[in-house]
Amino acid sequence: MAVNLTRRQALAAGAAGLTAAVAGGAGLVQAGVLPGRYRVGRLLGACDVGDPPPTTVAPGPLRFASFASKARGRPVAYGVAWPPGSGPGDRLPVCLLLHAAAGNERTPFERLRLHHHLAQAAGPGRVRPLALAWADGDGSGWRPAPGDDPFAMLLDELLPLLSGLGLRTSPGQVGVLGWSMGGAGALRLAERSPDRLAAVVATSPAVAASGPEVAGTGRLRALPVKIDCGANDPFADATRALAAALPTAEVAVAKGCHDGVFWQRQAPAQLRFLAAALGP
């Protein structure tokens, strides 16, 4: 039997159908069936994790310098941050920071404000003081290559420089923290030299679920490991694969995206984790 619709009814039915199609399409995108999942997630508020944690404590000293790296065959810029009330000559454990792909030795300081989060975390009665040190990966991808070994640069060249500044660089007193490409690099460094590190933290690590970083997690079982990733991050599934491969690790996939806001939100808990793991 034919059904005659008024113009208003036809328009209403069309609008309802369009709404259902859009909602269904968004659902398919979020489920990974259609491309654009992360862009749609951002539009839907998946990145809205609030402002970065407030920092009310003035940071401690910062130092930037460079050295000629034989391991990399080039000059390498680096930086060091001490907590408030400390400075060169103080015997503190140290955490190496590995920047993301678009970063350099100043990114943890200028973009992520890690020296402010360090000052906030290391206040009286809070966590054990530690220093932060970082170097410019300069397009290495934090992957060793013939004639360019960023890991040898960190362990065999930067650490002795830090020791000369009074920092404690024995294996039980050095940690590593990285973001994105640097998060993957932190895992690779720890898998390559687990005896040189006391803890590893990877934020939004840029790895594949079937990649060597996941396959190599057996070498990390004796280390304290913390991994954080946003649920709307392209590497969330790989982070879940890391969690399955390394059940001893502290792994969290929470609301957030692959961005600096999410990374800063993780900083206080990550610094507490590192301070607890590094030796006195």
Task: Give each language-model segment a name.
Residues 2-5, 9-280:
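Non-catalytic cap/lid and distal C-terminal segments of serine-dependent acyl enzymes
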